[in-house]
Swiss-Prot record:
It comes from the Eukaryota. Belongs to the UPF0725 (EMB2204) family. This is UPF0725 protein At1g27860. It holds the Pfam family protein_MS5. Residues 268-279 have a biased composition (Polar residues). Residues 266-289 are annotated as: Disordered.
Length: 289
């Protein structure tokens, strides 16, 4: 990792540099930060002889792999640090790069947790298609009504029985503006319609899609008076939210969400979902608990 040795800069420049540094570290999950420039006091990447990796405790990798070399590691600059370790392991014919994160829990004693132990993601791996990259546009009304292999509209009783749908909507509202509801609390929004899109086409019964590891959830609701991300004001205004849920093989849950207020169009965007008109709103309006 390059450093800023013997370079003078103002406090404002330093603070900006610190923010940029930690943003880059966060984007790589703390592992691959060689190309991130940082002031000397923030330098956390150390290059060691790969042979020293033989001293790393092999059980952290599981019984089917043997440690080959320690490639690099990064650490947080605390008394009790987190170590972000990249190492090479094999079984023994197939070599695989691993990422391991070890968190110290107490200074001056043996008390640590292995928070991450995973193969490094191959950049050439086949992507998850529609469940990768930016969120899609809102589907067209025609797709919602007729493309049953792709979309499943939940009955009110179905989404009420799964508290994660209302929970995800609450998280989206609060994440959009955390300070807006400090005094008043979360508004009592009313869900009108929920449509789910998954990889499991023709799943029978269709409600099994609720348990899919990868899903887009399209929610129509009212009751949100205003938001910095929304133009129209008023509790009566029908809002649309798109939320992606991905649970990977290691059990990590990733949520990505946004409000949708774009213009209705019949064109498709990035080979994902066609954008379209508003969904009907003639359903009953149960409140979020």
């Amino acid at each position: 990792m390059p450093t800023e040795d013997r370079v003078c800069f103002t406090w404002e420049e330093y603070a900006r540099h610190v923010r940029e540094y930690w943003r880059g570290v966060a984007e790589s999950d703390g592992f691959d930060s060689e190309d991130i420039r940082s002031p000397v006091v923030l330098t956390g990447l150390f290059h060691y002889d790969c042979q020293s990796g033989r001293h790393y405790p092999e059980p952290l990798l599981g019984t089917s792999f043997e440690l080959a070399a320690l490639l690099k590691f990064n650490k947080t600059m605390n008394l009790t640090s987190s170590y972000y370790i990249t190492l090479l392991a094999h079984d023994p014919s197939l070599e695989k790069t691993f990422q391991v994160r070890v968190d110290e829990r107490e200074y001056g004693s043996l008390d640590l947790t292995v928070a991450i132990a995973r193969p490094k993601k191959d950049q050439n791996e086949v992507s998850d298609g529609v469940f990768q990259g930016p969120l899609p546009d809102w589907p067209s009304e025609d797709a919602l009504r007729h493309d049953r292999n792709r979309f499943y509209e939940l009955e009110i009783s179905e989404w009420q029985a799964t508290d994660w749908i209302s929970l995800y909507l609450k998280l989206l509202i609060l994440a959009t503006d955390r300070g807006m509801f400090v005094q008043t609390g979360l508004p009592q929004v009313q869900i009108l319609e929920v449509v789910i899109e998954t990889e499991e086409e023709n799943e029978k019964p269709p409600d099994k899609r609720l348990n899919a590891r990868r899903a887009h959830v399209y929610i129509t609701f009212t009751g949100l008076p205003k938001s910095p991300r929304l133009v129209e004001i008023g509790e009566h205004v029908e809002r649309k939210a798109i939320i992606r849920r991905v649970i990977d093989a290691s059990g990590y849950l990733t949520l990505l969400g946004k409000f949708w207020s774009g213009k209705d169009t019949d064109q498709q965007r990035s080979m994902t979902l066609p954008s379209g008109e508003q969904a009907e709103s003639s359903k009953k309006r149960p409140r979020l608990s």
